[in-house]
Each structure stands twice: as C-alpha cells, then as structure tokens.
Regions:
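A short beta-loop-alpha structural element at the N-terminal edge
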Residues: 1-8
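A short helix-loop-beta-strand connector motif used in the catalytic cores of GNAT acetyltransferases and
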Residues: 30-40, 49, 54-58, 77
Length: 151
C-alpha cells in the first residue's frame, strides 16, 4: 500500500547514513520486489521499524550483496533494517532478529549483512556482535567503508 511505502521510505531516509539512502519510492519498491523476506514493526498502527532481506540468486546489484553472492551458495542477506529513533532500546531490534533467525534456521541459511565502519555505526556494530554475528571481511568505497558479518 502507498501509505506503507511512504512510511518505510521516510523511516529509511531518517536513518541515513546508518542505512543507505534510497533514491525514491520506486527504488524502495524495487528492493521489496527483489526481497524474499520483510518484516514491519508497528506501534499504534504506525510503522516504527522494518527489515528487508534477499536470498542468493536475486538480481540485486549492490556491491555488498555481491560480496556474499561470490562466497556463499545460499544465504539470507539483510539489505536494510531501521528502527524509529523514539522506539530504540525497547527490544524491537532483538525481536526483528529473533524472527529472522527463526526464518533462516528453518531453511538452514546463514544470515549475511554489512555495517558501516566509515562513518562508523558503533551502535550497530555492538548490536550485531551481541547477536552473535562474526566479522568476515571489510571493504572501502570512495565515500564510506563497511564490515561484513555472518551468523
């Protein structure tokens, strides 16, 4: 629904640079079409968090996705996850990842993701390490750097 897309787009843009910026709602629609697993977190019927994940084999052109595509036969890639600033540190991130872990475990999939290291996203690095992710690589781009993680 357009309302949901608008809300997800806005939440994504409010979470940059921790989450990659989207060019447009059309860009968001394309990501959702490519995705295999999504989850919305609601509070009083308002979207306060979301996650968008892709499986191996989709036609996603992200360099970060390609890092895992070149190394793994199968995986669940967390393309983006965002929580509204006013709803952080309330357990929503843990709840989203518990759902993702259950989904991935059902299909025996490793979960792959990256976290920005330049500019540094220390809260996300700390969170993913607490959730059991292990660093498996890093990459420097012209305007940012990332660390790659698997669980």
């Amino acid at each position: 629904c357009e309302f949901e897309l608008d809300a997800i787009f806005k939440l994504n843009q409010l979470n940059t640079p921790e989450v990659g910026a989207l060019e447009s709602i059309e860009h968001l629609k394309k990501l959702i079409e490519l995705s295999s697993y999504n989850l919305l977190m609601l509070h009083n019927e308002e979207i306060v968090g979301f996650i968008i994940c892709m499986r191996e084999g989709c036609m996603y052109e992200s360099e970060n996705y390609k890092f895992f595509k070149q190394r793994l036969k199968k995986f669940l890639y967390v393309d983006r996850v965002a929580i509204d600033l006013n709803h952080r540190r309330l357990g929503l991130g843990v709840a989203i990842y518990k759902d993702i872990f259950a989904h991935a475990n059902n299909e025996n999939l490793p979960i792959a993701l990256e976290v920005n290291t330049q500019p540094i996203n220390q809260p996300s690095l700390n969170f993913h390490e607490r959730m059991g992710f292990e660093k498996v690589g890093s990459r420097h781009f012209d305007d940012h750097s990332v660390a790659y993680f698997l669980k």
